[in-house]
UniProtKB/Swiss-Prot annotation:
This is Arginine-containing cyclodipeptide synthase pthA. One of its GO terms (molecular function) is ligase activity. A motif (Conserved DDXXE motif) lies at residues 419-423. It comes from the Eukaryota. It comes from Penicillium thymicola. The conserved DDXXE motif is essential for catalytic activity. Arginine-containing cyclodipeptide synthase; part of the cluster that mediates the biosynthesis of a highly modified cyclo-arginine-aspartate dipeptide (cRD). Within the pathway, pthA acts as the scaffold-generating enzyme and is responsible for formation of the cyclo-Arg-Asp diketopiperazine (cRW) from L-arginyl-tRNA(Arg) + L-aspartyl-tRNA(Asp). Additional enzymes from the cluster then further modify the cyclo-Arg-Asp diketopiperazine (cRW) scaffold.
Amino acid sequence: MSTLYLLANLRNRPDGRHSIDFGSLSARESDPVKMPHEITGLFSSDYCSSTSTTLEAEESEAYSKALSRNKRAAGILEHFLNGEQAAAHPSVCLQDRARLRLCEEAILVGAPRGTATRAREGIASYDKMEFLFPGSRQRKSIQMLHVSCPSLQPGATLLDSHSGSVHDSITILSGMCLFTRKILNSTTTNGRLDGQKLRHMPPTLYEMECIARLSAIIADVTTLTQSNFGEDNHPAVNIVLDLPSWHYYQFIEDCIKSDTCSLEEAIDWTEAIKLRRQQLASVLKKAVWHELGQRQVAHKSTLKAIQISPESTVVDELIKETLQRGHQPRLDDILHALSGTPHSLWPQFYSLLRDRDKPHSIRDLGFLFYVFQVVRPALLKAIPCQEAPSSKAPACEQPNLHRGQRQCLPQRPLIISLDDRAERKIYSQAHSLLLRLSRSSNQLVNPTLVQLYMPRRVYIDGNKDGQRLYWHDPSPVLPLLEGTKEQQRRDARNHDHHRRELQQTDILTELYGRDCSANIQGWFKEAGLC
């Protein structure tokens, strides 16, 4: 029996505290429901296909369809990333080339029927994939991934038969939120803004767990996409980390409009948000560089840069300047600033939007900006045939034309996103816009979007409502390690909780190992957050 992945269950207790326990999901062929993790709707693929499954017929069919659908997509991804030669000679290429191996095992997750999460996310299957790195310190990394790649045709490859690149550029895109929803709400209570509370907030469980989970998969995918190229034929590889800042203005907009807070409070609050974003970006970048180093590609010339939310600064600055002048930011002013920035790609993005998709509020714009970050790498390549690439663009974003490549040929940027499945609305809209861009009569670009989603490692109340950690993280309150009912009663009588309180780093150690936990704690200290 093999363990597929480790998980945690965060529970709301009757006494108002939170408790947490840990478990693992194993590959079982016929064992019905002796599921120690007690997570509703979470099963191994072996259990779902077993004749002894207790799933209702309709539910069993839904799980089976999800499993089959993702297995097909994962197979396309495996062939795509490994290239023609690896597909033809897997035993030979395995010895000296990084490659991806799709395994039989998978896990399936679905919130209970009738919940909003089930309606929004459906049932997702995550296939076990082994990233193999011969010759590096970390020779193998295992990920459970849900794959969506509608623009990839079966047989498509990243490498051609001569190990050359099919794509002109590769962008690895991921991101995370700041704080938790609960903490942000607590700083806007009764219309008053508490920026100082944000400034002194220690790292949340959500933030630390998200960095641990993202950094490894970012490094895995980046390494695989660049390590098989030679020095003379590699495409530009960029990592883009999208962390929000001005997007949180929606939290305080009503306070400002109703005059329940001062503009000075609003400025202090937004500056605290920007500081947190800067700190988290620093930690996440260090975590990614560390993981890349473990795979021995941290300083390879193919990796151009790690960028943080390109073109977002202009909105931050406009909101701050507007508040300092004693005015409230307006949507039209922000759109004008985005369009008026030299070398901005926002005008091209905005022209792709239908009228019904254009923003009517700053809240709408915040969502669209996430979509913009996904589409932006393709816009960088969407150059009319008669025009040369702009020499004024940042060096890390310069188009990379290989020897013998004609400039009037369609550019083929590859965008690989790594995220939580709850965010798939962003990528669905981005995919539609990329299709519209590729069909444009005046742009020569043929982008490919590959969406990879990771399963959650921390579930809330046994996944009974499909809730996410970001919304229900109890931080800064520490959860209690779940004990027996007798221990819980004894603790309640003695008011003795401290002996079983778990720090966020304790939880990381259980899920990701001691080294990962210690490293992340150290990087947070360097950023001034521990």
